């Protein structure tokens, strides 16, 4: 589980936009780039190679 306080200081590594946390999938979502970054053992994996592309339905 992610410490929600991190959302105030982290940003998407590609566009520097705000990320939102999706608890049920344990991912950080960038709505601008349509990417989902996994949170592994409470640590956000903010690497493009770890991200998956998401559809607008998943956002």
Swiss-Prot record:
Cross-referenced InterPro entries: Trm112-like
Pfam families xref list: Trm112p
Residue pairs linked by disulfide bridges in the UniProt entry: none
Gene Ontology CC terms: cytosol
Family, as annotated: Belongs to the UPF0434 family.
Protein name: UPF0434 protein Ping_0902
């Amino acid at each position: 589980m992610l410490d929600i306080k991190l959302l105030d200081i982290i940003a998407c590594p590609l566009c520097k936009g705000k990320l939102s946390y999706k608890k049920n999938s344990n991912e950080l979502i960038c709505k601008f780039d349509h990417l989902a970054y996994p949170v592994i053992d409470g640590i956000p994996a903010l690497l493009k190679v770890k991200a998956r592309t998401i559809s607008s339905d998943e956002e």
